[in-house]
């Protein structure tokens, strides 16, 4: 007869075997879902190692290519790569995973991106949704004047000088500065906004500080340069300081709207920090993601001179045209610019931008959500009874490479948007995911698209571009995905005639 000690040991081993092997591998509601790695049912260590090594995006993409639209990444984590999955998870308003709150909260104070629960997010989104709507932005006199100032007095004069002197320029930091100046002017008004396009050495210092900011703890961020800088911008507004000498003073559209809304409908957050936390998120996204989009759009166009010519023909149909005076015709007057709606209606420009955002999504990484707790669980692509609290996500990188929707998906082919197969354009648009989808879709998507189209129309009306140095142009595939080499050196040549 076995001793009590031996019997206890056998029982313990049996329980451990059941808990750590039999249950997760064979009895878990997730057991039928293909495993991305043989250890996925047991531990998250494998996927965490891939994340920490910066290989999460490609790892998940390859897992979907091998196993299909739903894969298990860890004991309580799934990745989904299908249109039906998007509808269930994101249109179905699954709440965000705690990961967002850990990573994106500024000043120890919630903002929309960092809010896990849908209700407070919806409340704050209602405060700002009108001023970020496409109709409001296209009709905005303030945004029109911001565009005229940034283009006429900052960007185009720099490109004219670079072209005249036959210099090359790193367009990544320059166009990140364009994004920052556009965004900060819409938030704070032109008299209180940044002017980093004209201060590129100072801007590079800011970018260096921001690289450190991205890996800091919450506590270190609060004492650091970036949060202090943003808070100083907000406090200048409260003191009614207006340091910039500009030809047109625009309204602080976003700042005023958010401040007034929080005054009328306060919550338990300190109002100054609630405003600063939200606006810092806008400033971060507004310079980084648009700067990436500008860079890869110019990189692709620079490899296709014939397409540049075709795009220019399309741009010259605008009225007024974006023609900027040559160096011998210097003028201090602001450009008259085409309406945003007329620029938005240009099919080739739209196709080039869409294809750039598809292939070179600035945010290629998974956007995690948590499955809701329901009586019978949830169903995804034929897998049923998925319990609540499971980390679940999709990523634009994988979605944008579904071959059935985007044939030869690794190739940059703008004409796929102009000449889609019968009925295919609907799926192409539904799977187009650089801004997410559903109630948590990026609030600034319309602003970003309008800005990028406006700026690129101005650039390619006046210049051709040519690559001088694109070493390290491949994306690092981080959450916000920059070129590995942090540069793209281009030559700008004025268009004759």
What is each residue range found by the language model?
Residues 481-497:
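C-terminal helix/juxtamembrane-tail motif
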């Amino acid at each position: 007869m076995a001793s009590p000690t031996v019997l206890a040991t056998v029982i313990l081993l049996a329980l451990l075997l059941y808990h750590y092997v039999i249950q997760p591998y064979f009895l878990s509601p997730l057991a039928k879902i293909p495993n991305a790695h043989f250890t996925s049912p047991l531990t998250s260590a494998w996927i965490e190692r891939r994340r920490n090594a910066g290989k999460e995006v490609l790892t998940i993409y390859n897992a979907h290519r091998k196993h299909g639209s739903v894969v298990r990444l860890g004991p309580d984590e799934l990745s989904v790569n299908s249109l039906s999955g998007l509808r269930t998870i994101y249109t179905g308003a699954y709440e965000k995973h705690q990961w967002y709150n850990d990573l994106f909260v500024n000043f120890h104070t919630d903002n929309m991106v960092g809010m896990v629960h849908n209700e407070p997010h919806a409340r704050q989104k209602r405060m700002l949704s009108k001023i970020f709507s496409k109709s409001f932005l296209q009709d905005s006199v303030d945004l029109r004047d911001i565009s005229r100032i940034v283009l006429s007095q900052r960007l185009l004069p720099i490109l004219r000088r670079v072209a005249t002197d036959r210099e090359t320029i790193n367009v990544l930091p320059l166009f990140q500065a364009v994004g920052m100046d556009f965004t900060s002017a819409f938030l704070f008004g032109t008299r209180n906004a940044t002017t980093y396009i004209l201060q590129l050495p100072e801007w590079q210092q800011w970018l260096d500080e921001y690289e450190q900011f991205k890996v800091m703890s919450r506590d270190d961020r609060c004492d650091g340069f970036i949060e202090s800088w943003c808070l100083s911008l907000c406090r200048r507004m409260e003191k009614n300081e207006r340091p910039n000498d500009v030809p047109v003073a625009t309204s602080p559209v976003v700042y005023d709207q958010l401040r007034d809304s929080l005054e009328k409908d306060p919550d338990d957050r300190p109002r100054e920090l609630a405003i600063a936390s939200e606006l810092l998120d806008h400033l971060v996204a507004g310079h980084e993601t648009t700067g990436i989009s500008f860079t890869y759009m110019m990189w692709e166009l620079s490899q296709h001179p014939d397409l540049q010519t075709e795009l220019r023909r399309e741009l010259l149909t605008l009225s007024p045209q974006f023609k900027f005076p040559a160096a011998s015709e210097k003028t201090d007057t602001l450009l008259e610019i085409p309406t945003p709606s007329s620029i938005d209606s240009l099919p080739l420009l739209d196709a080039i931008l869409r294809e750039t955002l598809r292939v070179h999504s600035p945010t290629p990484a998974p956007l995690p959500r948590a499955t809701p707790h329901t009586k019978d669980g949830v169903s995804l692509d034929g897998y049923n009874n998925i319990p609540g609290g499971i980390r679940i996500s999709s990523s634009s990188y994988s979605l944008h490479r579904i071959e059935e929707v985007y044939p030869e998906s690794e190739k940059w082919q703008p004409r796929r948007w102009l000449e889609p197969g019968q009925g295919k354009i609907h799926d192409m648009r539904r799977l187009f995911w650089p801004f997410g989808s559903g109630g948590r879709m990026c609030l600034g998507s319309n602003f970003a698209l309008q800005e990028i189209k406006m700026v690129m129309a101005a650039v390619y009306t006046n210049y051709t571009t040519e690559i001088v140095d694109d070493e390290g142009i491949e994306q690092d595939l981080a959450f916000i995905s920059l070129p590995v080499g942090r540069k793209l050196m281009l030559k700008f040549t004025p268009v004759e005639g």
